[in-house]
Curated annotation (Swiss-Prot):
Gene3D superfamilies: EF-hand. The keyword Calcium applies. Ca(2+) 2 binds at D109, D113, E120. GO terms for molecular function: calcium ion binding. GO terms for cellular component: troponin complex. This is Parvalbumin-like EF-hand-containing protein. One of its GO terms (biological process) is skeletal muscle contraction. It comes from Homo sapiens.
Length: 134
């Protein structure tokens, strides 16, 4: 059975280390969906809006810890792949492709070591360097 939009948005938020209530889901802009697929860039922007500036650093820290599955202090390709594996490929959301995930790592990886540390991750979120979905 396919999950509804609300369930998938809650999973996405959990994967990012935060959560969305049913009320938050209702407040999501309708333009976040385009031709039945999900607009990740608008989702990330909206999540940042849900957290007041005083809460943004905490939200980023929580999201980083959630994504850093092995607690190495880095988000690595295998951890990105894990997140991709828990996002359903059908329904109102479209998971990132391998190429889009690689583009995200490259956008954030300012040190060029193929992985994302906390500072790079924080900068990615704060500076909106998330690559656009094709």
């Amino acid at each position: 059975m396919e999950e509804d939009f609300s369930s998938q948005m809650k999973k996405m938020a959990l994967a990012m280390g935060t959560s969305l209530s049913d009320k938050d889901i209702e407040l999501l802009p309708t333009d976040m969906r385009h031709h039945g697929s999900f607009n990740y860039l608008k989702f990330f922007k909206h999540i940042r809006k849900l957290h007041a500036s005083g809460q943004l650093d905490d939200a980023i820290h929580t999201a980083f810890q959630s994504l850093d599955k092995d607690k190495s202090g880095f988000i690595e390709w295998n951890e990105i792949k894990y997140i991709l594996s828990i996002i359903p490929s059908s329904g109102p959301t479209t998971p990132l492709t391998d190429e889009e995930a690689e583009a995200m790592i490259q956008a954030a990886d300012t040190h060029g070591d193929g992985r994302i540390n906390y500072e790079e991750f924080s900068e990615l979120i704060k500076k909106e360097k998330i690559p656009k979905k094709k």
